[in-house]
Regions:
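N-terminal Rossmann-like NAD(P) cofactor-binding subdomain of oxidoreductases
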Residues: 1-172
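Oxyanion-binding "anion nests"
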Residues: 175-186
Length: 186
């Protein structure tokens, strides 16, 4: 039996992941009391019991958790904090022919973002085959629902009265300052 701790289980991603993993008979999902969810020392005690820790936390909290975990167990990070970090393996098995093996043997795996994943799977093969130059300037137009913004954004937008004017798309990231840009350049 593999012990899994979902750090951030009460968040949007953590809840969905816990629901899916609960169906697996080969996994035991380790729990933490609700009043200890943000207590790093309480979470650290659970890290030592886990074979795998899945971080479903905001970026800074994921960095702090990863430091506390160290080499105690395998870690999968769903945040953007470690996606381009040199000591983490990018969790996109289709990225290269050897990536699946890298992921299988890795101690620290960063979960790819949705936009970068789609972008990389489309553009990278074109560059590798010489069909597209790596220097070509590209634009990625993408739309998302608000759930991608996490619990705070969901709460804010669900409390806002629904009207046509308030439901239009919002433009952002036009100055290449979006958090996924560096990941899309892998």
């Amino acid at each position: 039996m593999t012990n899994v701790f979902i750090d951030g289980q009460a968040g949007t991603t953590g809840l969905e992941l816990a629901s899916r993993l609960a169906k697996r008979e080969d996994l035991t999902i380790l729990q933490i009391p609700e009043d200890s969810r943000k207590d790093l020392s309480a979470r650290s005690a659970i890290y030592t019991k886990a074979d795998i820790v899945i971080l479903c936390l905001p970026d800074q909290a994921a960095v702090e958790a990863a430091e506390a975990i160290g080499d105690k167990c395998k870690v999968i990070d769903a945040s953007t904090a470690h996606r381009t970090h040199k000591d983490w393996t990018y969790g996109l098995p289709e990225l290269t022919s050897a990536q699946r093996q890298r992921i299988a043997g890795a101690e620290k795996v960063s979960n790819p973002g949705c936009y970068p994943q789609g972008y990389l799977l489309l553009v990278r093969p074109l560059i590798e085959e010489g069909i597209l130059s790596a220097e070509t300037l590209l634009r990625c137009n993408a739309l998302s629902g608000y759930s991608g913004g996490g619990k705070a954004m969901i709460s804010k937008l669900e409390k806002t009265p629904c009207n046509d004017e308030g439901m239009v798309s919002r433009i952002y990231g036009l100055n290449l300052d979006h958090k996924h840009v560096s990941e899309m350049q892998i």
